[in-house]
């Protein structure tokens, strides 16, 4: 599988990144409990198959249930062959405020140490802040402790996971960060306006939510009534699917990979068939300028409604 540089980090990542949330906890449309998930042994087997197929980039987090533990077991003997990314646990209190600076530093350090232990490694390649909102991004104590931990060799690249274009712009303007994981897909293309700036500043981009938690796949049918307009809009991609001779998941993935500024596309994988589908998209053939323009015109007319965290809170994705 072709690899791309992650900004100016010097880290080479596969075009497809294995999203590890589904192997660690119930997640996604149609996955309501542990009985819908792979066993630990099957999950490890799937990770090994992904690695043997050319994927070297694996994404996990403290909050993803058993995901870190499973990846630690899967790659203990191949640690130097894979790029591991994990995320700090949530920093905000239940009231939406940040703890004091001293407590923040302790939380960040403890989260990283716990991840290293669970992943059975003495470093990770990428350590990210999860759901980095304005309060978090403006806090100098967080940047300070992360810089200290990076200097100690506990991770190679300092990153953030953002949701909004305002958050992504703050990250790019700050000059502190090596990479950003952000949402970008056929339905909601707003973050694409910042790709050129990220490339100019040497910040690597990892795109997530390309399949919108399964909506842009065979799971995106018979949705909650609140998502009826979204379901109807998905049908509008049929002409582009026929023109490209692709299935919707492949089109969605190729769309993101067609932007040279994107280092890797994060795909949630919990079944061999979804791995195989992802692998078929990385054939070196991307959407040309004309097809990208058509895809742009087919973006959802109210992109602010494409809000997975909100949909989750409303239980629209069960």
Question: Residue spans of the language-model regions?
Answer:
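Active-site groove signature of glycoside hydrolases
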Residues: 116-135
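Acidic (Asp/Glu)-rich catalytic clusters
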Residues: 72-83, 116-120, 150, 172-175, ...
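Short, acidic/polar
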Residues: 34-50, 103-120, 162-170
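Beta/alpha (TIM)-barrel catalytic core signal, keyed to glycine-rich beta->alpha loops juxtaposed to Asp/Glu
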Residues: 132-305, 316-318
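Conserved, mostly hydrophobic/aromatic
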Residues: 6, 18, 50, 58, ...
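Short glycine-enriched, charge-decorated loop/helix-capping segments at active-site entrances
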Residues: 29-37, 97-103, 221-224
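N-terminal binding-site loop/beta-alpha segment at the start of enzyme catalytic domains
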Residues: 1-82
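Structural preference for beta-strand elements that scaffold enzyme active sites
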Residues: 13-17, 56-57, 63, 81-85, ...
């Amino acid at each position: 599988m072709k690899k791309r540089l992650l900004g100016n980090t010097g880290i080479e990542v596969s075009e497809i990144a294995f999203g590890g949330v589904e192997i660690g906890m119930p997640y996604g449309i149609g996955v309501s409990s542990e009985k819908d998930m792979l066993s630990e042994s099957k999950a490890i087997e799937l990770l090994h198959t992904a690695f043997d197929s050319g994927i070297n980039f694996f994404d996990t987090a403290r909050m993803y249930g058993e995901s870190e533990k499973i990846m630690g077991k899967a790659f203990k003997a191949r640690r130097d062959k894979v790029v591991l990314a994990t995320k700090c646990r949530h920093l905000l209190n239940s009231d939406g405020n940040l703890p004091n600076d001293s407590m923040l530093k302790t939380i960040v350090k403890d989260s990283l140490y716990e991840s290293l232990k669970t992943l059975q490694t003495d470093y990770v390649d990428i350590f990210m802040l999860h759901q980095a909102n304005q309060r978090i991004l403006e806090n100098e104590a967080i940047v300070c402790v992360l810089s200290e931990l990076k200097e100690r060799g506990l991770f190679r690249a300092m990153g953030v996971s953002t949701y909004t274009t305002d958050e992504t712009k703050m990250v790019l303007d700050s000059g502190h960060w090596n990479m950003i994981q952000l949402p970008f897909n056929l339905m909601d293309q707003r973050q694409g306006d910042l790709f050129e700036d990220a490339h100019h500043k040497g910040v690597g981009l990892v795109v997530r939510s390309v399949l919108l938690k399964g909506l842009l796949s065979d799971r995106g049918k018979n949705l909650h009534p609140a998502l009826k307009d979204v379901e109807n809009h998905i049908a509008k991609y049929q002409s582009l699917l026929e023109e490209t001779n692709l299935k919707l998941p492949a089109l969605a993935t190729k769309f993101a990979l067609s932007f040279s500024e994107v280092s890797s596309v994060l795909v949630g994988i919990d079944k061999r068939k979804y791995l195989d589908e992802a692998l078929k998209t990385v054939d070196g053939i991307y959407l040309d300028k004309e097809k990208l323009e058509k895809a742009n015109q087919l973006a959802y007319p109210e992109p602010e409604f494409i809000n997975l965290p909100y949909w989750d809170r409303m239980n629209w994705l069960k």
